[in-house]
Curated annotation (Swiss-Prot):
This is Ribonuclease 3. Transmembrane segments: none annotated. The active site is at D63, E135. It catalyses: Endonucleolytic cleavage to 5'-phosphomonoester. Residues 18-146 form the RNase III domain. It holds the Pfam family dsrm. Residues 173-242 form the DRBM domain. Homodimer. It is found in: Cytoplasm. Its EC number is 3.1.26.3.
Length: 245
């Protein structure tokens, strides 16, 4: 459920919401003031007093932390990839499109504090706001728990996207591209439904169906639900212009 940023300041209610967010991600956090700042957009702080913090400084820090973690992970995990391939992969992973897509995956937008103007303009779904917030969140994790914990979080969140990129041989985020296309053309969002799981627990394959409205569009399979959704989105996007919804 979306949180109305004009309804509260940093109250017990807000702490409960932040606790819910952390629980969903299985993350421990010591400094809730720091976490709250990471999820406070400048439009929100501007509506309060000048002493109120926003996430711009944490975004600045998190951008560098995120780049280092991704660079280190790519270098160590893909020793046979060239410098050019690694640079291209890193640029894609830390792009606004990728960061905003990952932010949507963890429902980050629901916990961002926004000013009334951004709230009314669907700021929770804006790529720039989501990408900035996830950078600020990474910066906050780094300050709160150190580089190792920040690395574990980032790698756990991003590794599937990196593996998909190299496996497909391209650097497109089909879920984000499909969502933009469908929202622009039909004013709704695509819906992914888990159809079935095949195989033993140690080698499970997930089968996902993709719908636009009530209409079935495509399906996809993968070693995780996210991978299956990405593959379903890829099929749908390539066929969408030929489908009469």
């Amino acid at each position: 459920m979306k949180k109305n940023s004009s309804d509260f300041c940093f109250s017990n209610e807000r702490k409960a919401q932040l606790s819910e967010f952390l629980e969903n991600l299985s993350i421990d956090f010591n400094n809730f003031d720091l976490l709250n700042t990471a999820l406070s957009h400048s439009s929100y702080s501007n509506e309060l007093d000048q002493k109120s913090d926003n996430n711009e400084r944490l975004e600045f820090l998190g951008d560098s932390v995120l780049n280092l973690i991704i660079t280190d992970h790519l270098y160590k995990t893909y020793p046979n990839k060239s410098e050019g391939e690694l640079s291209k992969a890193r640029s894609y992973i830390v792009s606004e499109d990728s960061l905003s897509s990952i932010a949507r995956e963890i429902d980050l937008g629901s916990y961002i504090l926004l000013g009334r103007g951004e709230e009314s303009n669907d700021g929770r779904n804006k790529k720039g706001i989501l990408a900035d917030a996830i950078e600020a969140f990474v910066g906050a994790i780094y300050l709160d728990s150190g580089f190792l914990i920040a690395t574990e979080f980032v790698v756990g969140l991003f590794d599937m996207y990196i593996r998909l990129m190299f496996n497909r041989g391209d650097f497109k985020d089909y879920k984000s591209l499909l969502q933009e296309y469908v929202q622009k053309k039909y004013k709704i969002s695509p819906n992914y439904k888990l159809d079935k799981e095949i195989g033993p627990d140690h080698d499970k394959v997930f089968c996902v169906e993709l719908y636009v409205g009530e209409k079935f569009i495509s399906n996809g399979k993968g070693k995780s639900k996210k991978e299956a959704e990405m593959r379903a989105a890829e099929v749908a996007l390539k066929a969408m212009e030929d489908i009469n919804l």
